[in-house]
């Protein structure tokens, strides 16, 4: 049985339990209101009676998350996910609730934690300034999603009875509409581009809807631009890898799962490594057909690359990469982004990020194929088709307007339907104002005599 003891402005629920060593212990739990204490008392008694009571556990959140990462994370995460999730834990979870006990995390604590996060300064990434002053709502959503997953395991491991993050109320996230270039601006940018690597990358991003990592991880063995392919409109690329940077810790923890190649670093003491890895989702592994012009551009680029190989000889490090540095080594995204910024400045183009070319591609394709979501999804590699409908709904709305216009011309413009005219309104009968008529007759005896003569004439007829 449990009891409630009032302590100044709070209430304690006191009960005995048997720990994992078989010893009887007493537990005091503090609650702010009598109503909360009564609810907890009933909960404890009910669980003890039906055998579902979990003994108190003093494990701290930080220790629990360490166990969670080393058991769950190692099995479920790739290296990029591992780095991202452990960064959230180190920057925004452990500093705030890491010293709390797992069993002390209640829905009320979760609500206060979210409020604290909204006032927490953003942590800068290495060599990069934070984009916002405080933690964004999008980041808070990622943090709570991670904790919801972690505490689901805590329930499974019988550390807690229920997940306090299940019904967490998140701050509203407003997704800003991305600025993108239209087709004419992209054409102008390509005309002004003088950097060969950037030129290839821009064409692949726009024509093939590729992500940056997919462009930089593309190898020549997956580029099919032979004469017979082009003649049959069957030139294509196959996306099966992406270039990214991962921490040595993630690689050591997870092994080489989903990693195709680890590039030898130029400076061996760095804490990260460039790797070629499998894309995050199965839908990202895909075949994308090439416009003929892009196929010819790639052929010319390969020819110039082969000439460079012959000139450099053994100095060229051949990793079979399509977009590579002059010595053959992988080209990181920061190099492309820097050249892209220089191009925008030189050509006086609107300021967009390189990734926006992928959004321009999706927008352009949806217009060309009149909203064919499945075909567009095949090129973009989105895991869920809903991701396209949410982001590009305005394009689909334009096509829906066109649908109404087509419906009008195809159906309602039929001459037979035009014969169905709407009913005409019947003219209303004129009414006589008797009071005004009597007044006029009194003022004009001549009018009264004329009217009397007319009435007599009508009767005679």
Regions from the PLM with identified roles:
Residues 3, 17, 70-157, 175, ...:
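N-terminal core-binding DNA-recognition domain of tyrosine site-specific recombinases/integrases
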Residues 7-111, 303-317, 397, 412, ...:
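N-terminal DNA-binding module of tyrosine recombinases/phage integrases
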Residues 17, 266-275, 281-349:
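Active-site/catalytic core of tyrosine-dependent DNA strand-transfer enzymes
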Residues 123, 130-137, 141-143, 156, ...:
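Basic, Lys/Arg- and aromatic-enriched nucleic-acid-binding interface segment
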Residues 156, 203, 207, 214, ...:
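C-terminal catalytic core of tyrosine-transesterase DNA break-rejoin enzymes
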Residues 172-173, 180, 231, 241-245, ...:
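Catalytic-site neighborhood detector that most strongly recognizes the C-terminal catalytic loop/helix
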Residues 222-231, 332, 350-351, 370-393:
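Short, polar N-cap/turn motifs at the start of nucleic acid-interacting alpha helices
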Residues 225-236, 241-285, 294, 405-461:
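C-terminal secondary-structure termini that scaffold catalytic or DNA-interacting sites
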């Amino acid at each position: 049985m449990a009891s409630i003891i009032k302590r100044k402005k709070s209430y304690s629920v006191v009960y005995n339990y048997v720990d994992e060593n078989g010893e009887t212990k007493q537990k005091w739990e503090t609650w702010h209101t009598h109503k909360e204490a009564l609810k907890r008392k009933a909960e404890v008694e009910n669980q003890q009676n039906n055998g579902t009571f979990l003994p108190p556990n003093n494990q701290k959140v930080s220790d629990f998350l360490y166990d969670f990462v080393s058991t769950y994370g190692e099995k479920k995460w790739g290296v990029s996910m591992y780095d991202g999730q452990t960064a959230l834990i180190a920057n925004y979870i452990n500093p705030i609730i890491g010293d709390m006990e797992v069993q002390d995390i209640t829905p009320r604590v979760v609500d206060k934690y979210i409020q604290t996060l909204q006032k927490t300064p953003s942590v800068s990434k290495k060599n990069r300034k934070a984009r916002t002053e405080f933690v964004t709502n999008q980041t808070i959503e990622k943090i709570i999603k991670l904790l919801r997953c972690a505490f689901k395991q805590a329930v499974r491991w019988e550390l807690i009875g229920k997940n306090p993050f299940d019904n967490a109320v998140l701050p509203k996230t407003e997704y800003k509409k991305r600025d993108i270039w239209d087709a004419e601006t992209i054409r102008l940018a390509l005309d002004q581009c003088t950097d060969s690597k950037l030129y290839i990358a821009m064409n692949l991003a726009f024509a093939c809807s590729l992500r940056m990592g997919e462009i930089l991880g593309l190898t020549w063995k997956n580029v099919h631009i032979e004469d017979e392919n082009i003649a049959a409109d069957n030139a294509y690329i196959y996306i099966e890898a992406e270039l990214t940077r991962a921490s040595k810790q993630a690689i050591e923890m997870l092994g080489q799962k989903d990693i195709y190649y680890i590039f030898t670093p130029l400076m061996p003491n760095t804490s990260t490594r460039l790797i070629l890895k499998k894309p995050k989702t199965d839908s990202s592994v895909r075949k994308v057909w090439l416009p003929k012009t892009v196929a010819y551009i790639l052929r010319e680029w390969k020819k110039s690359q082969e000439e460079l190989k012959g000139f450099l000889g053994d100095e060229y490090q051949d990793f079979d990469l399509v977009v590579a540095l002059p010595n053959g080594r992988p080209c990181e995204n920061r190099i492309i982004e820097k050249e892209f910024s220089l191009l925008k400045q030189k050509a006086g183009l609107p300021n967009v990020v390189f990734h926006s070319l992928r959004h321009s591609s999706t927008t352009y394709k949806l217009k060309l194929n009149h909203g064919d979501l499945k075909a567009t999804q095949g090129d973009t590699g989105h895991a869920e088709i809903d991701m396209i409908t949410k982001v590009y709904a305005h394009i689909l709305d334009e096509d829906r307007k066109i649908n109404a216009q087509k419906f009008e011309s195809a159906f309602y413009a039929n001459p037979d339907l035009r014969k169905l005219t709407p009913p005409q309104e019947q003219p209303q009968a004129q009414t006589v104002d008797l009071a005004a008529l009597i007044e006029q007759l009194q003022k004009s005896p001549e009018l009264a005599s004329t009217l009397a003569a007319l009435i007599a004439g009508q009767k005679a007829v």
